[in-house]
Amino acid sequence: MAQFYSAKRRVTTRQIITVKVNDLDSFGQGVARHNGKALFIPGLLPEESAEVIITEDKKQFARARVSRRLNDSPERETPRCPHFGVCGGCQQQHVGIDLQQRSKSAALARLMKHEVNDIIAGASWGYRRRARLSLNCPPDKPLQMGFRKAGSSDIVNVEQCPVLAPQLEALLPRIRACLASLHGTRHLGHVELVQAGSGTLMILRHTAPLSAADKEKLERFSHSEGLSLFLAPFSEILETVSGEAPWYDSHGLRLTFSPRDFIQVNEAVNQQMVARALEWLDVRAEDRVLDLFCGMGNFTLPLATRAASVVGVEGVQALVEKGRENAIRNGLHNVTFFHENLEEDVTKQPWAKNGFDKVLLDPARAGATGVMRHIIKLKPIRIVYVSCNPATLARDSEALVNAGYEVTRLAMLDMFPHTGHLESMVLFERM
């Protein structure tokens, strides 16, 4: 009878070695050298020495954990959050913000083989205008409300979260008390909080119908806190209990959105990012501009305030409809939105028949492989690529460089301080 064994990590004997860290990777791990290869050590900073235990040993690199830190870097910070190290939300609160930004910029520069010209950043605390907190109410135990543990599905009960917008953080204990008082706590899935330009939103996901008494209690809570409340009994259904359609500002334009629509988490960085895209593209009154993966028009509509015409292409129908509504609401009549799958053959899609002078694209983590060939065929003068995944950015950039484009500006977007997320934007110009 055949037997199957799960692959095991190659681990050395648990000997303690002393190392000195000389670098920090973009995820906030200290990097040392041992036996001629990189040794990654969470929790250590450059110029710190420590006794460590190797936990994983591979051909190209190894990992270790700290047994005893021997000195502290001047760039080490005391984490503000009492849940840091347990909650999986933040990985770098022990790292000074300047070092965080330098390490992310260095990683981006290495990957793109180009210096980082700009760091676009806002406040490093209180920046998150959106959060999703998991809910669980085990039998005979208090309601759990918080974020997932690092590497686990367990919930960390959070009483505070200093990266949340102050208005949202202040609500946490009162929301917990309200939800814990409901009769249907065992049917609660998660709660989403959004700080929109129009005020605070609360979206409550529940897996079974709420009683009339529970709904009434939630509505009273929403009125007393001055927030808009939405119930989500199923993934595709949203019931408005109180409040109106929310909106946020993008480069002076008011964009309404559905409470579940994607909006950038960091408002300050989003505003700077949109302004920088307009600057880099050097949009002029005669320009025809293409915005791919456009969402509800975060870039599209500001572009339309300057260009002769703008075309936005997006794969989610609801976002396309919202983009059209927002164009009308803002009096922009030179915008056309298309609902198309940009992972398919785009050459037969109606928007692809047009010519464009300049292109902006803001794809998801998978990147934009499906449209790169067509972008090159369009021969735009300038291309701005906004990325949430440096690996796919580097891959797609290679296609543009091979087609005669040159990277002329590279910016690191510090969209998520104290985390390992690395976002960026690049300007390509046709040579």
Swiss-Prot record:
InterPro entries assigned to the protein according to its UniProt record, in alphabetical order: 23S_rRNA_MeTrfase_RlmD, MeTrfase_TrmA_AS, MeTrfase_TrmA_CS, NA-bd_OB-fold, SAM-dependent_MTases_sf, TRAM_dom, U5_MeTrfase_fam
> What region holds the TRAM domain?
10-68
Q: Tell me the residue numbers annotated for binding S-adenosyl-L-methionine.
A: 264, 293, 298, 314, 341, 362
Q: Which UniProt keywords apply?
A: 4Fe-4S, Iron, Iron-sulfur, Metal-binding, Methyltransferase, rRNA processing, S-adenosyl-L-methionine, Transferase
The record's active-site residues are 388
UniProt key word Iron: yes
Q: Give the transmembrane region(s).
A: none
Q: What is its EC number?
A: 2.1.1.190
Give the GO terms filed under biological process for this record: rRNA base methylation
Gene Ontology MF: a single term: rRNA (uridine-C5-)-methyltransferase activity
Catalytic activity field = uridine(1939) in 23S rRNA + S-adenosyl-L-methionine = 5-methyluridine(1939) in 23S rRNA + S-adenosyl-L-homocysteine + H(+)
Which residues are listed for [4Fe-4S] cluster binding in this entry?
81, 87, 90, 161
Q: What does this protein do?
A: Catalyzes the formation of 5-methyl-uridine at position 1939 (m5U1939) in 23S rRNA.
What family classification does the UniProt entry report for this protein? Belongs to the class I-like SAM-binding methyltransferase superfamily. RNA M5U methyltransferase family. RlmD subfamily.
Name of this protein = 23S rRNA (uracil(1939)-C(5))-methyltransferase RlmD
Q: Gene symbol?
A: rlmD
